[in-house]
Amino acid sequence: MLDKRDYTLIIDKSGSMSNTDRGTNKSRWEIVKESTLALARKCDQLDPDGITVYLFSGKFKRYDNVSAVKVEQIFQENDPMGGTNLTAVLQDAINQFFQRKKAGQAKGGETILVITDGEPDDRRSVFEVIIEATKKMNSDAELAISFIQVGSDASATDFLKALDDKLQSIGANFDIVDTITLADMEDMTLAEVLLSAIND
């Protein structure tokens, strides 16, 4: 559970995150903000170090030791704009984990939660980054990456399904990716999905 793992949240802040989907009265960005707050509050109780939060579009920014209070500030400082360059941010998060592991500072393992609404601009290199990471791992418990889709973009769903199904067939040593599309969420809110991901 939480006290045995480190958690990193990677949030898409590309321009389309300001869209509002049918059946909701909030933008994707607002929904993600509320859900991140719920997750941070839960983590505040369980892990006093806070969580690591990244925001990415064309470039990315990392925030360490994030508490619920800091989440508010992060979302105030950022507005959705730009593209979806997922490779650089994912590479940084994975590198951080391996650096901590090497220094003996990693807990039992790391879970990276990626919240995105579109297919990344760099689909192929996202696969490569994840496959490379699995080659440095000794067991599949060390690192888990969950991709969670917000919105209903069909190409995003297709990309996530490919990540979930094809990694090992194209060279990954372990299947470390789990994906949750909008359909998988059914009646769960994004906050509930995030909380269930850390309870696994």
Located regions from the model:
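Acidic, low-complexity intrinsically disordered regions
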Residues: 1-200
